[in-house]
């Protein structure tokens, strides 16, 4: 496998399947990652995954990765984390921002993102399928000739 994508999931996403299923769906994070691993394997791309409720662990994973692309669901850090934004900008790895719910149809504080203006694209409101869309787009970009 010549390409690698880092999948970053932020706080509380470890509770998927149990936390507000009417908003976030019934799939667990493990289910979602398993499906993405199959999609990546078919495309002969390596998918590395981290989920953490600790901002510094996500930052350290971004600093340490040798991936050529990042897919990130910053979760609640979307609206608060300049540090995570700076980590992404510091490594200069292109990234897609994903959200399970349509953040623009929710509370006003969820409308602001510290990431959207720097992301290749933002996918929200499609549930777990949003990750599949982001992975397909990332794979397509990685396979485009320079």
From Swiss-Prot:
Signal peptide: none annotated. Coiled coil: none annotated. Pfam families: DHquinase_II. The keyword Amino-acid biosynthesis applies. Pathway: Metabolic intermediate biosynthesis; chorismate biosynthesis; chorismate from D-erythrose 4-phosphate and phosphoenolpyruvate: step 3/7. The record marks 19 as: Transition state stabilizer. Its EC number is 4.2.1.10. The active site is at residues 24, 99. CDD domains: DHQase_II. PROSITE patterns: DEHYDROQUINASE_II. GO terms for molecular function: 3-dehydroquinate dehydratase activity. GO terms for biological process: amino acid biosynthetic process; aromatic amino acid family biosynthetic process; chorismate biosynthetic process; quinate catabolic process. Keywords: Amino-acid biosynthesis, Aromatic amino acid biosynthesis, Lyase. It catalyses: 3-dehydroquinate = 3-dehydroshikimate + H2O. Substrate binds at residues 73, 79, 86, 100-101, 110. The keyword Cell inner membrane does not apply. Belongs to the type-II 3-dehydroquinase family. Catalyzes a trans-dehydration via an enolate intermediate. HAMAP family: AroQ. This is 3-dehydroquinate dehydratase. The lineage of its organism: Bacteria, Pseudomonadati, Pseudomonadota, Gammaproteobacteria, Alteromonadales.
């Amino acid at each position: 496998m010549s390409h690698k994508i880092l999948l970053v999931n932020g706080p509380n996403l470890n509770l998927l399947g149990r936390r507000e299923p009417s908003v976030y769906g019934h799939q667990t994070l493990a289910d979602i990652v398993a499906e993405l691993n199959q999609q990546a394997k078919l495309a002969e791309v390596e998918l590395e995954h981290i989920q953490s409720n600790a901002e510094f662990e996500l930052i350290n994973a971004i600093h340490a990765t040798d991936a050529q692309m990042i897919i990130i669901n910053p979760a609640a850090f979307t609206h608060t984390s300049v540090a995570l934004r700076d980590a992404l900008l510091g490594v200069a790895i292109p990234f897609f921002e994903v959200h399970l719910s349509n953040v623009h149809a929710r509370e006003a504080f969820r409308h602001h993102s510290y990431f959207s203006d720097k992301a290749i694209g933002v996918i929200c409101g499609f549930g777990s399928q949003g990750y599949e869309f982001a992975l397909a787009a990332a794979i397509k970009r990685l396979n485009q000739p320079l």
